[in-house]
Amino acid sequence: MANKKIRIRLKAYEHRTLDTAAAKIVETATRTGAEVAGPIPLPTERSLYTIIRATHKYKDSREQFEMRTHKRLIDIINPTQKTVDALMKLDLPSGVNVEIKL
């Protein structure tokens, strides 16, 4: 797999679990002999939801909820077959969405 690049994009609601998953991926890739660029923090998506607290009236009484999606990007340059096999067997924490592009 010479002159190839694997781009891994991670998404999670909690930044601590996201950083642990990114550290596991980087450690696995470097242990198998591939070059790693990252983890690069991407902009955090912020969704804001405003709802009325009361069921029927009192529109002035509202509550706001926020949901943040943290993202990281990892590039693995010149991966070997050993790197790909190790990444496929890697156990990541639940709650982390992984997108892989070759």
UniProtKB/Swiss-Prot annotation:
Which InterPro entries does UniProt cross-reference here?
Ribosomal_uS10, Ribosomal_uS10_CS, Ribosomal_uS10_dom, Ribosomal_uS10_dom_sf
- Which residues, if any, are the signal sequence? none
What GO cellular component entries does it have?
A: ribonucleoprotein complex; ribosome
* Superkingdom of the organism of origin: Bacteria
Keywords per UniProt: Ribonucleoprotein, Ribosomal protein
Q: Which GO terms describe its biological process?
A: translation
**Which Gene Ontology molecular-function terms are recorded?**
structural constituent of ribosome; tRNA binding
Q: What does this protein do?
A: Involved in the binding of tRNA to the ribosomes.
Q: Belongs to which family?
A: Belongs to the universal ribosomal protein uS10 family.
Q: Which PANTHER family match?
A: 30S RIBOSOMAL PROTEIN S10 FAMILY MEMBER
Kindly state the subunit structure of this protein. Part of the 30S ribosomal subunit.
Listed name of the protein: Small ribosomal subunit protein uS10
The organism that produces this protein has a lineage beginning with: Bacteria, Bacillati, Bacillota, Bacilli, Lactobacillales
Q: Which gene encodes it?
A: rpsJ
